[in-house]
């Protein structure tokens, strides 16, 4: 009886060990299967960084090449920017009259999800290419993009974002001047802005990212560098109505006849709090920063003002455009829009309000935007006239800027972005 009990005990112990071994093996297999594609991509990218470095030598000027070589993540992002769009198997053909959509994002995932959800309901979105431009690399933002299945989508990542440079420029360096008057004491690097304040990488990244994105989309990507038509620009806290894409197509088609002097077409009024007039008339007004679109000829006009853009002491790209670039065109810069908005700015937390810092803005991203039946169909008619708004309030020539953009290093990096796709590596910063 004792022997029988002993055999049973040994058999149970063996089964228990076998069960533990099976569980451990299964856990390892599941862990390997669940490794994010981005991690695998990173591994494959690292395998060929030397080849990428040689490739960059032929494409970047010496200044940008020096910055990129100092950061392994920067090199990896350069490589990722050449990846083909996703979902080409689901949407193999793009419409010839497409308006490419570019989505400028940072790290506000709670907003980004809302914007992506609204895009998924936009009629005609499957006919075009969506480009998501990231300010550096944030895994949660990357996962949201990888979940998109409603159109072709391409990701680009700013490889010069201060967020990926922890101890060197464009991030924070140990030798940076930090407080007012530090530069007078010597032994620190950096120029103050017009108010005596030194650069904040988190702040300057807003303008750097926008300018890098514009130059990359118009001049650097295979998918868009030959695109002559309009490109629509939106941000991670913009809610698009279902009729947004069809409306912007209509506006860009009508613009040459209805408003030949208009530089752009907008989905929303320049006053972000307005939902529009609701009148039966098109509107020509100052260009807004919600759902704005323009074509390559306008981009060329903007690009010619790179020095004005890069040397204006304001960290906001839009205020820089209103106060110095647009006035330099020599005529009022009007945009054409409908009488009812097709896009809404819903964010409460600004891009300059980060996480983990004093004064952070907390918002769970829950929005309640009413979408009416008229917001689901094209609500712009070709027979309408155009109401022109002149002498609107807002930033104009003569405004000297809010500062935050006084460091010569930022200004010259900005100028380098303007030449990175137009000159060889022998070109130096202007």
UniProtKB/Swiss-Prot annotation:
Pathway: Protein modification; protein glycosylation. It is an enzyme of class 2 (transferase). Coiled coil: none annotated. Substrate binds at residues 104-108, 135, 205-209. It is a single-pass type II membrane protein. SUPFAM superfamilies: Nucleotide-diphospho-sugar transferases. Keywords: Disulfide bond, Glycoprotein, Glycosyltransferase, Golgi apparatus, Manganese, Membrane, Metal-binding, Signal-anchor, Transferase, Transmembrane, Transmembrane helix. Disulfide bonds join 177-188, 259-262, 310-414. It comes from the Eukaryota. PANTHER family: ALPHA-1,6-MANNOSYL-GLYCOPROTEIN 2-BETA-N-ACETYLGLUCOSAMINYLTRANSFERASE, BETA-1,2-N-ACETYLGLUCOSAMINYLTRANSFERASE II. Its cofactor is Mn(2+). The keyword Transit peptide does not apply. This is Alpha-1,6-mannosyl-glycoprotein 2-beta-N-acetylglucosaminyltransferase. Its EC number is 2.4.1.143. Residues 36-430 are lumenal. The gene is GNT2. One of its GO terms (molecular function) is alpha-1,6-mannosylglycoprotein 2-beta-N-acetylglucosaminyltransferase activity. Glycans are attached at residues 41, 61, 295. Its main location: Golgi. It is found in: Golgi apparatus membrane. Mn(2+) binds at residues 237, 345.
């Amino acid at each position: 009886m004792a022997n029988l009990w002993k055999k049973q005990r040994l058999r149970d112990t063996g089964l228990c060990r076998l069960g533990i071994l099976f569980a451990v093996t299964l856990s390892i297999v599941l862990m390997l299967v669940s490794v994010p594609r981005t991690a695998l991509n990173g591994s494959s990218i690292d395998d060929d960084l030397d080849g990428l470095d040689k490739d960059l030598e032929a494409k970047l000027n010496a200044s940008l090449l020096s910055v990129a070589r100092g950061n392994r993540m920067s090199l990896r992002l350069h490589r990722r920017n050449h990846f083909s769009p996703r979902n080409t198997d689901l949407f193999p053909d793009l419409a010839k009259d497409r308006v490419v959509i570019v989505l400028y994002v940072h790290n506000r995932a709670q907003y980004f999800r809302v914007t992506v959800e609204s895009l998924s309901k936009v009629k005609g979105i499957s006919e075009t290419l969506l480009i998501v431009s990231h300010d550096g690399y944030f895994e949660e933002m990357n996962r949201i993009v990888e979940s998109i299945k409603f159109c072709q989508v391409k990701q680009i990542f700013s490889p010069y974002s201060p967020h990926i440079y922890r101890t060197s420029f464009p991030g924070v360096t140990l030798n940076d001047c930090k407080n007012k008057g530090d530069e007078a004491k010597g032994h620190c690097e950096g120029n103050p802005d017009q108010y005596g304040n030194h650069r904040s990488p988190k702040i300057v990244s807003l303008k750097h990212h926008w300018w890098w994105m514009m130059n990359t989309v118009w001049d650097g990507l295979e998918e868009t560098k030959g695109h002559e038509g309009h490109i629509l620009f939106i941000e991670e806290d913009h809610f698009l109505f279902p009729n947004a894409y069809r409306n912007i197509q209509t506006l860009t088609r009508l613009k040459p006849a209805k408003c030949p002097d208009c530089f752009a077409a907008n989905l929303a009024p320049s006053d972000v709090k307005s939902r529009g007039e609701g009148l039966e008339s098109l509107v020509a007004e100052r260009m807004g920063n919600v759902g704005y679109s323009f074509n390559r000829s306008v981009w060329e006009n903007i690009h010619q003002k790179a020095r004005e853009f890069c040397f204006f002491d304001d960290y906001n790209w839009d205020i820089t455009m209103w106060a110095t670039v647009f006035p330099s065109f020599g005529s009022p810069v009007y945009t054409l829009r409908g009488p009812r908005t097709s896009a809404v700015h819903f964010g409460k937390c600004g891009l300059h309000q980060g996480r983990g810092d004093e004064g952070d803005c907390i918002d769970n991203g829950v929005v309640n935007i009413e979408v009416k039946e008229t917001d689901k169909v094209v609500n712009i008619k070709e027979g309408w006239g155009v109401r022109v708004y002149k002498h609107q309030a807002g930033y104009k020539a003569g405004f000297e800027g809010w500062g935050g953009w006084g460091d010569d290093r930022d200004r010259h990096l900005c100028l380098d972005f303007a030449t990175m796709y137009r000159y060889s590596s022998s070109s130096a910063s202007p």
